[in-house]
Amino acid sequence: MNRKTHIPVENETKSSATRTTNDGRAITYEMQVLQQPQRARACGQGAKSSADRRPVDPPPIVELKIFEGEKRDDITYTMHANYFLFATLEQARPIAHARGQDRNTHPVLTGTPVAGMVYLDRPTPAGYFIFPDLSVRHEGEYRLSFSLYEELKNPKDEDKPEEACDAAGGDAHVTHRLEVKSAPFHVYSAKKFPGLTESTHLSRMVAEQGCRVRIRRDVRMRRREPKSGGKDWDEYEEDTAAARARASATPDPSINGYMQTPHGFIEPNPRPRSASNASHQSLGSISRRPSMQEMGQAYHQQPHYGTAPHTPQNGYTQTAPYGPPPGQQYPPNQFVQQQPPMQPPLPQYQPPNYPAPPPPVTAAQQPQPAQSYYNYPAAPPPPQATQVQQYNVSAHAYDSGVQSHRPSIDFPAQDGYRRNSQQIPPTSQPTAYTQPMQPQYAAQMPPAQHYQQPPPPPPSQASQHSSYSSMDLYNSRPAPIEPHHHGNTPASKASFDLPPINTAAMVSNKLEASSPTSVAPTNAYFSGGQTPIDTHKRSYGDVFSNRHHNAPLRQGQRPSYGQGDSLVTGTTMSAADDDDNASSELDPSTLGMHYRRADGRQIQRALPGHA
């Protein structure tokens, strides 16, 4: 700060003035700035400036003494008048004003710029003016100017008439006596402010005598490391002028080996770009389908039957024993449903032909083992050994079944392809693979798509269970189970019927009548294996009205029932049709109350006492 030029003033720190009263007495006023301001933090402008202000530190303290005559008698305590000091802010350095800016605009000074005089005994008996609440809005170099104003109470202490007009400048109640200026001090920004210092001895002394001064007993200075060069912005700007001029120049197009940057000339990095694509492996889709080349490599390693591999529907996905495909380096998410891979062309992967099975045995002697391949019990052979049963391999029949019950193939141990499989307890025959193909579909397929039934395994392996294998992803589904032949079926005709489903337990547990869809005709699988219909049971049309099933309903019509078309009537049911009535007498429960529900159904309630 020594190199900076400040505006010189005559009344810095000390100032004095003398006047003559009406009775000819000479009164001298002397002011001295006992405590100079040293630093302040700029509080800025806006709503938050008043809430976060830092006062000028330390608080300025100005001392006033009044003397009378040439003997300089101290009349500070005996002078009958009121005194107050008004503080203003001035620039300590010359500032060039911008164009259009008013030269009379002063820096903004906030806080309490006015202080009244207090009489204190220490450090010396005198009048003191204390400014504990002064703040500056902008950073820079400033000085404070203090102006003393006097309000006289005794008429004899007033100035002479000719001097009073010049001093007051009109009819005024107060008179300006003198002015004193403080030493220059620096106002820092919030970032560079070093902090408030500990309260001075003078501030403590004034506070002990009852004046309102904030006392700080701890050091609150901020430790800031000096810059490496110790240079201010002005010197730094001069040193870096050449470098900034170089950076703003246009680069020379003839220079190829170097490039120009704001920080100078640097040599480009000669290292070539890496050719590794390891960082792109994680960008692939998790559920990407393998390409035809990948499918071909997988299909050449094991025998196939021209069908699409199966994707398990459970939450735990199975991967191939030799790792994921080349385009997928990370295992797929366990909770993302995988898309099934593309099905390879059927003519390219033809199923192998198996030899004819051994001579068959009768249905009564041969039990029906579970369906399997290789080391699992196979289905019973057909009645005639000379006839070869051919089954159609269809992706439609494969996809239409329930895949959760599908047992996979457990192949013999092979090098590099054997994995532990998850055992599944034996269950009933899965419906997805016991449903045979219709004859019309088999006639449309080429002969190369048929294969013979595998030979039956030894009886010792009949108790083994089917299991899930990881090879199931690239192998076809198991062959359909051998159909069961009835005794009245001709030997020369191939039957695709299976044993009938036992529905006795299902019917006994039902609490309501079957819907019309349950009694509708089904496919050949169910039609051939059903038991003969009991003639003593009533049909659906005898008990319930099926008129609204066939007749169309137009324009908001609802099912309407005539007198003879009621859902439950006592006249349509005869006593002979009811299995529960052994006698020919009419059941009283049929003569109960009849009413119709909102959905059109007719409800019957039995008579009291006959329920």
Swiss-Prot record:
Observed phenotype of the null mutant: Impairs the biosynthesis of secondary metabolites, including dothistromin. Impairs asexual sporulation but shows normal hydrophobicity.
Positions of region (Disordered): 1-57, 222-497, 511-611
Domain Velvet per the UniProt entry, residue ranges: 24-216
Segments for region (PEST): 455-499
Domain of life: Eukaryota
A Gene Ontology cellular-component term: cytoplasm
Biased composition, class Pro residues, residue ranges: 341-361
GO biological process, one term: sporulation resulting in formation of a cellular spore
Regions annotated as coiled coil: none
Pfam families to which the protein is assigned, alphabetical: Velvet
Keywords: Cytoplasm, Nucleus, Sporulation, Transcription, Transcription regulation
Subcellular location: Nucleus; Cytoplasm
Compositionally biased region (Polar residues): 14-23, 274-290, 419-434, 511-533
Biased composition (Low complexity): 242-254, 330-340, 362-377, 435-452, 461-471
PANTHER family: DEVELOPMENTAL AND SECONDARY METABOLISM REGULATOR VEA (PTHR33572:SF14), SPORE DEVELOPMENT REGULATOR VOSA (PTHR33572)
Domain remark text: The C-terminal PEST domain is a region rich in proline, glutamic acid, serine and threonine residues that is required for the light-dependent regulation of development and secondary metabolism.
Family: Belongs to the velvet family. VeA subfamily.
Subunit note: Component of the heterotrimeric velvet complex composed of laeA, veA and velB; VeA acting as a bridging protein between laeA and velB.
Name of the protein in its database record: Developmental and secondary metabolism regulator veA
Source organism per UniProt: Dothistroma septosporum (strain NZE10 / CBS 128990) (Red band needle blight fungus)
Lineage: Eukaryota, Fungi, Dikarya, Ascomycota, Pezizomycotina
Gene: veA
